[in-house]
């Protein structure tokens, strides 16, 4: 297969408490489980899942209404820890000799003439230029790769911000 190098801004979640109190669980559907099956991880993922048969709607008057996720109430979507899933995926990918991970590296831009990603090692302050046959930039809301594209001539885009804010809820068993 291809040689794959992953550069991640955050620290290695396998050695830090990256997700403690900062992330809500993911809802993984049948489609997501099929994807995990395709890469041989369905059983491991299912062991980490908590089935959710429906949702509870709370109105402003204090009334509640339980709504099943399926018409017959028999099918569930599954809740899974984002951190645990990421660790499983990283460990699985890292088990291949052609895959390597580099944590604490922030993408600060792209050199569109050479196709190189411009990275900053946030631990050492070292600047790196990384190239590959294909560069896939998934560097988030304040993307250095996107900023580089926006500065290029005749690049058209639109950007819309969602007005909602984030609210974390914690329910003790």
Language-model features: locations:
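Short, intrinsically disordered, charge-balanced linker/junction segments flanking boundaries
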Residues: 170-173
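Conserved N-terminal helical subregion
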Residues: 29-168
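Conserved SAM-binding loop
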Residues: 6, 25, 137
């Amino acid at each position: 297969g291809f040689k794959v190098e992953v550069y991640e801004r955050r620290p290695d979640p396998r050695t830090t408490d990256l997700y403690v109190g900062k992330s809500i669980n993911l809802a993984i559907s049948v489609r997501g489980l099929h994807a995990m099956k395709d890469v041989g991880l369905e059983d491991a993922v299912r062991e980490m899942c908590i089935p959710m048969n429906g949702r509870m709607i709370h109105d402003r008057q204090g009334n509640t209404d339980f709504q099943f996720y399926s018409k017959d109430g028999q099918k569930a979507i599954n809740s899974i820890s984002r951190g645990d899933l990421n660790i499983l995926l990283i460990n699985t990918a890292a088990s291949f000799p052609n895959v390597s991970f580099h944590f604490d590296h922030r993408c600060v831009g792209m050199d569109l003439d050479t196709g190189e990603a411009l990275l900053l090692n946030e631990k050492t302050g070292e600047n790196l230029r990384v190239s590959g046959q294909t560069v896939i930039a998934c560097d988030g809301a304040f993307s250095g790769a996107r900023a580089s594209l926006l500065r290029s001539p005749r690049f058209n885009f639109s950007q819309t911000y969602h007005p909602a804010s984030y609210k974390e809820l914690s329910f003790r068993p």
